[in-house]
UniProtKB/Swiss-Prot annotation:
Entry-linked InterPro entries: DNA-dir_RNA_pol_bsu_ext_1_sf, DNA-dir_RNA_pol_bsu_external_1, DNA-dir_RNA_pol_su2, DNA-dir_RNAP_su2_dom, DNA-dir_RNAP_su2_hyb_sf, RNA_pol_bsu_bac, RNA_pol_bsu_CS, RNA_pol_bsu_protrusion
Cross-referenced SUPFAM superfamilies: beta and beta-prime subunits of DNA dependent RNA-polymerase (SSF64484)
Name this polypeptide is given: DNA-directed RNA polymerase subunit beta
Gene that encodes it: rpoB
Protein family (similarity comment): Belongs to the RNA polymerase beta chain family.
Keyword DNA damage in record: no
Length: 1301
């Protein structure tokens, strides 16, 4: 057992973080629990997540208006099986969702009152439930739902340049659900509208269609109407202008329509009509100040519509590609597209983004319309009309936020476009994190429920429409499979539901904190350009600039930074300290990218005096993407920690500040691939993040409060916690063991990547513990710190060319002492199905198999635990029926004599695959059939008796604590929820009264809101105790029902499987040539040679080094951090301490030198080494020290294989490739050249014929080998026949002349 006393640690950090980093799994856990709100009482549930989805899906009515199905509330049952049971049986860890619905009906649609209502709890399916580790178990596999970074709903302004050099601007309104609408300027100075990227039409037609029917109204919206007096002096001013409104001669009835250019003749007509003034369109020329709004006038002048009807027809025709049947149809089509909340939804985020972006336009418009009485009235009328439209489509009253598009949004967008044309506004940056938001697991699940409930709603309506009888209940209408099938397919097939990377705790945690731009509704690898992949200045403190994959997904998959959190709108926030006039306050605020825009922030490293004032007059700050020098008084915010910028994996790299970004990226990624070793060892040079990652990944077991260790073994730890009746938070008062909690160790559990997860206690009997004390280590931790590799003595020097090109030379000591030995656990599964020909069977009685092969099988045909198995050994004996033909008379006679035993069965046993050997560490057998042995009735009676005893103990414990709390107290008010007095005020809590409390009816009837004793503290403790008692009673009942269910039905298995056998084989893999190793700085390599200890270079005192790295791997890679680590690691080993050097806040060059000097080592970190082979001293001094090396999960055992014969491709008839297909090694064009160069004609012919695609030749060769004959002449390869056919296809007649000359 590990010693609890850990190595002393020295921290080099100069700056302390102001706040503690949040729980690294908070992103997953909070998102899911906010979605289901399982711990929130029904009355306090907020309208979010599942509650919001269910409310939006109901009520459902039929077309006749006779039925109304309403939603009331939902609830969950507890999971039927534990997480471990689900993994073993291949089941899904889920809970059943039950929804309380109310169905009302009446005889006639025009009746006001409903005749009758039926309220019922309906089963709506099972949904996967998140484990404490932030994962889901789906069909026995642990999966993670990755958060998606996608374009935020709202409005986005962009620009493009036409080939003629003119800038064109566009505004795109992106809803959460519904049609996209885009406003675009063109080279002719007009504004067009595109809906769903279909045909375009002028924006004035859209404004006219929604209610601004006259030109004058549209022009008035943009202050483009000018009223000019009709005086002779104004003739020159008016001629050449355009009319803004119609001019009607009352006497003649003649009309001069709006948009008419005023000529001398028109001017005379207007004068003759007796008009004192005329409304014209404002003109713009270069000398005018302010905005040039001529784009609106141009658009109106080119608009072919003049009335609302014409505009509606244009909109309908362009979008539907046919004529509208009538105006009402066209109008309802437009209303459906943008003003129906069921069809079009901006979402809260979309409305928030539009409000933020166009706030100035909205306020300017409001101010402007306020002074225009008639126009204001028209605008209000249209607004009311839109609200009525929403209300008519949704059966609920309008909320505070209008989540559909309104005419005000369209006008504000046009105004912003006008500002863009005039150069008075800026376009948006689509890669800015204000325009991108995160869809976490909760939101993704909500989207699936919306789809499922929409389908269910359609089915319910169909059923209601076809029902004439009033005898119908909600349960008759709901089909649970409709919803659960959508959710199940999401978890099983979605690109964002991933098989969890479980190589080590860091890999597991990084997978949960990953943010992907891919997936449904996101980007694709092919479409994503350089800009979207690049690091953006808004990523600071939000997304890690280092950790991202190296392949085609680079920049599309990122990791959240250590302090980053996601707000309720899905935007990533990071914490900052508020700075006021140069004074750094202790106030910490969370800012999104939008909140931070235009603010001035400074790093945490700037000098601060004792009074928390910035100690210098000017500082280099950050604002937008620039780094200007600003006065201290202008600073708004300051970082909270130097680690804030990077993710957890990057924060684990010591001296990160000395590494090139590309190599740091590799270092962060390769730590995730480190295989847990036989004996874990924490780094002697760390960053201080190791403990945080180990704890938050949930791989270690932590204490839950003050107490002491009562018993500890390798299998479990028992801790007795102190019980505080008044401030009890961490421990149950009603625990029958009175504060004793047992923690079971995970032993040799297989991870998703076949690595081994195993826990071991690090506390001793009688040891005091507190909240957060590490009780047990995992296979990748030491003393509660992440331990992925080993501290080994390294020398940077070439050694006889064996470490050429990043190859690594190891000492044999690392093999003998199992320094880099790892355990890998492989799972093998066999199942029994009921086939058409009969049932399969697990058995050790297999025909034609030797006793030697069956020696390790038990009576069920399962291999015994502890057996050492190798390739082709039987793991599970299984027979399956053959397809039977009509039996012969002899067979009939045999069957009559011996029964059915002699019927044909074939051996379908499961064998150890090629290249595998190990020891069987665990076997499991599950059967759908009820367990034989003890009678089912007897088992059920035993369960009842056991749970009855537990209930009696629970009641005794409850009475004991209640007596302790209330003994000697007086009754203040003990009344029932119906107002009945249960005990007189002032009466003492005697034994008789206390005994009543444990009876269920009495307890349920008490109204605790009125108090019990009148003492607040006592009353709160009593209420907490009563709540816990009720909860535990229900828990007991559920647990009893669950156990009875399991006895009645046997083991639950996936559909179609009658029996399931699992065998786990453990392999011990030592480090060997071909294994990949790496440090934490991107310094990776493959083991090239393992030398005897005596051949390794050694120091003056005779100490041989463990590992030799090539010094040429350092300068060009620019990861100098490894040299700092090497020297400081040597000092740490000599001094017997551990160093913590946090990134951007760690040990300096001088401090490293000082520690080397303190350890009595050379300050430059170099010493003379001696050649192990000759004993001679090397010419130059060599950099020596301790570096933390990892063994990566790219092991040569998993990659190398050899093929004798095997499968061939059906198309080319050439051998397949790859280990999984038992394929061959590719012999390509350049390899052919190599053989040609050596003149190896026979080998070359063999390679290109019988070993490749000479089908006839290889069969003859096989036959010759079997018979021991000489090899025949090879035939014609299939690829030559393909060539002939291709040439024939080109019209060249080619025949093979196989006559021997």
């Amino acid at each position: 057992m590990a010693d609890a006393t850990s190595t002393p640690s020295i921290d080099f950090s100069k700056i302390q973080s102001v706040i503690e980093a949040p729980d690294l799994l908070k992103v997953q856990l909070d998102s899911f629990h906010n979605f289901i709100q399982d711990s929130v009482p029904l009355a306090k549930r907020r309208e979010q997540g599942l509650e919001k989805v269910l409310r939006s899906a109901f009520p459902i009515t039929d077309t006749r208006g006779l039925y109304l199905l309403e939603y009331i509330s939902y609830s969950f049952d507890k999971p039927k099986y534990t997480v471990e049971d689900c993994i073993e049986r291949g089941l899904t860890y889920d809970v059943s969702l039950k929804v309380k619905l109310k169905l009302s009906y009446k005889d006639e649609a025009d009746e006001t009152d409903w005749k009758e209502t039926i309220q019922q709890e309906v089963y709506l399916g099972r949904i996967p439930y998140m484990t404490e580790r932030g994962t889901f178990i789906v069909n026995g596999a642990e999966r993670v739902v990755v958060a998606q970074l996608h374009r935020s709903p709202g409005v986005v302004f962009s620009e493009a340049v036409h080939p003629n050099g003119k800038k064109m601007y566009s505004a795109k309104i992106v809803p959460t659900r519904g049609s996209w609408i885009e406003f675009q300027t063109d080279i002719n100075n007009q504004i067009f509208v595109y809906i769903d990227q279909k045909k375009n039409f002028l924006v004035t037609a859209l404004l006219r269609a929604i209610g601004f029917t006259r030109d004058e109204d549209i022009l008035g919206l943009f202050d483009l109407v000018e009223e000019v007096p009709m005086k002779a002096a104004k003739r020159e001013r008016l001629v050449g202008q355009y009319l803004a409104s119609d001019i009607v001669d009352m006497q003649t009835g003649e009309v001069v329509s709006a948009r008419t250019a005023i000529t001398e003749e028109v001017f005379e007509q207007i004068q003759a009509a007796g008009y004192k003034s005329v409304k014209i369109m404002k003109s713009f020329n270069g000398s005018d100040k302010g905005q040039d709004k001529s784009i609106v006038i141009n658009t109106i002048l080119n608009d072919s519509s003049a009335t609302e009807e014409e505009a509606l027809e244009i909109v309908y025709e362009e979008l539907r590609a046919n004529e509208a049947p009538d105006i009402d149809a066209a109008r309802s089509f437009l209303e459906r597209t943008f003003f129906n909340q069921k069809k079009y939804d901006l979402g809260e985020v979309g409305r928030y983004r539009i409000g933020k972006k166009l706030s100035r336009e909205f306020s300017e418009m409001d101010e402007y319309l306020g002074g225009k009485g008639e126009l204001k009235q028209l605008s209000d009328t249209i607004h009311q009309k839109i609200l009525q439209t929403i209300q008519s489509f949704s059966d609920e009253p309008i909320g505070e936020e209008v989540l559909v598009l309104t005419h005000l949004d369209i006008i504000a967008v046009i105004n912003y476009l006008i500002k863009l044309v005039n150069g008075q506004a800026e376009v948006d940056d689509v890669d800015h994190l204000a325009n991108r938001r995160v869809r976490s697991v909760g939101e993704q699940l909500a989207a699936q429920f919306v789809i499922g409930l929409a389908r269910m709603g359609k089915n319910v309506r169909e059923k209601l429409n076809s029902r004439d009888s009033d005898k119908i209940a909600p349960a008759d209408l709901i089909n649970a499979r409709t919803v659960s099938s959508v959710v199940s397919s999401f978890f099983a097939t979605s690109q964002l539901s991933q098989f969890m990377d479980q190589t080590n705790p860091l890999a597991e945690m990084t997978n949960k904190r990953r943010v992907s731009a891919l997936g449904p509704g996101g980007l694709t690898r092919e479409r994503a350009g350089f800009e979207v992949r690049d690091v953006h200045y808004t990523h600071y403190g939000r997304l890690c600039p280092i950790e991202t994959p190296e392949g085609p997904n680079i920049g599309l998959i990122s990791s959240l930074s250590v302090y980053a959190e996601i707000n309720d709108k899905g935007f990533i926030q990071t914490p900052y300290r508020v700075v006021e006039k140069g004074h750094v306050t202790d106030t910490v605020v969370m800012l999104s990218a939008e909140d931070e825009e235009n603010k001035i922030t400074v790093p945490v490293s700037i000098p601060i005096d004792a009074n928390n004032n910035i100690a210098v007059e000017s500082v280099q700050a950050r604002t937008k993407g620039d780094y200007p020098l600003v006065p201290s008084e202008d600073v708004n915010y300051m970082d909270v920690s130097p680690v804030q910028i990077v993710s957890a994996a990057a924060a684990l790299i010591p001296f990160l500040e000395h590494d090139d970004g590309n190599r740091a990226l590799m270092g962060a990624n390769m730590q995730r691939q480190a295989v847990p070793l036989l004996v874990s060892e924490a780094p002697v040079v760390g960053t201080g993040m190791e403990a945080k990652v180990a704890r938050d990944s949930r791989s270690v077991i932590l204490g839950e409060g003050p107490g002491f260790v009562e018993e500890v073994t390798s299998e479990f730890i028992k801790v007795r916690y102190d019980i505080d009746t008044e401030n009890n938070e961490h421990m149950s008062l009603l625990d029958p063991d009175e504060g004793l909690k047992t923690y079971r160790m995970i032993k040799f559990k297989r991870s998703n990547q076949d690595t081994c997860i195993s826990q071991r206690p690090i506390v001793k009997n009688g040891q005091k513990v507190d909240k957060g004390t590490v009780l047990a280590d995992s296979s990748s931790t030491e003393d509660g710190e992440l331990a992925l590799g080993k501290n080994v003595l390294v020398a940077f020097m070439p050694w006889r060319g064996y470490n050429f090109e990043d190859a690594i030379i190891l000492s044999e000591r690392l093999v003998y002492d199992d320094v880099f030995t790892s355990i890998h656990v492989h799972e093998f599964e066999a199942n029994v199905r009921d086939t058409k020909r009969g049932e399969e069977q697990f058995t050790r009685d297999i025909y034609n198999v030797s006793d030697e092969a069956l020696r390790n099988l038990d009576e069920n045909g399962i291999v015994r635990i502890g057996a050492e198995v190798k390739e082709r050994d039987i793991l599970v004996g299984k027979i399956t029926p053959k397809g039977e033909s009509d039996p012969t008379p002899e067979e009939k006679l045999l069957r009559a004599i011996f029964g059915d035993k002699s019927s044909d069965v074939k051996d379908a046993s499961m064998h150890v695959p090629a290249g595998m050997k190990g020891i069987v560490i665990k076997t499991k057998l599950f059967s759908r059939k009820k367990k034989v042995g003890m009678d089912v009735k007897e088992k059920l009676e035993l369960i009842d008796a056991r749970f009855e005893r537990r209930e009696i103990e629970l009641r005794k414990s409850f009475e004991k604590w209640l007596r302790q709390m209330l003994q000697g107290k007086k009754v203040k008010g003990l009344t029932s929820d119906k107002g009945k007095v249960l005990a007189d005020e002032g009466a003492a809590f005697d034994d008789a009264l206390l005994a009543k409390f444990s009876s269920q009816p009495f307890l349920e009837s008490i109204d605790f809101t009125l108090g019990v004793t009148g003492t607040k503290k006592v009353d709160e403790a009593v209420i907490r105790l009563v709540k816990e008692f009720r909860f535990k009673l229900k828990d007991l009942a559920d647990e009893r029902d669950n156990e009875k269910y399991k006895v009645n039905v046997g083991d639950e298995l996936p559909p179609g499987i009658e029996e399931l056998a699992k065998v786990y084989i453990a392999q011990k893999r030592k480090i060997q040539v071909g294994d990949k190793m790496a440090g934490r700085h991107g310094n990776k390599g493959v083991v090239g040679k393992i030398l005897p200890i005596e051949d390794m270079p050694f120091m003056a005192d005779g100490t041989p080094v463990d590992i030799v790295l090539n010094p040429l791997g350092v300068p060009s890679r620019m990861n100098i951090g490894q040299l700092y680590e090497t020297s400081l690691g040597w000092a740490a080993k000599k001094l017997g301490v551990k160093f913590k050097t946090p990134i951007f806040n760690g040990a300096t060059y001088e401090e490293v030198q000082a520690e080397l000097e303190r350890a009595g080592l050379p300050m430059h970190g170099k010493v003379r080494l001696y050649d192990g082979r000759t004993g001679e001293q090397f010419d130059d001094e060599v950099t020596v020290g301790y570096i933390y090396m990892l063994k990566l999960s790219h092991l040569v055992d998993d990659k190398i294989h050899a093929r004798s014969t095997g499968p061939y491709s059906l198309i080319t008839q050439q051998p397949l490739g790859g280990k999984a297909q038992f394929g061959g090694q590719r012999f390509g064009e350049m390899e052919v050249w190599a053989l040609e160069a050596y003149g190896a004609a026979n080998i070359l012919r063999e390679m290109l014929t019988v070993k490749s695609d000479d089908v006839v030749g290889r069969n003859k060769t096989y036959e010759a080998i079997v018979k021991g004959q000489n090899l025949p002449e090879p035939g014609i390869p299939e690829s030559f026949n393909v060539l002939i056919r291709e040439l024939q296809g080109l019209g060249l007649e080619i025949r093979i002349d196989d006559r021997v000359p």
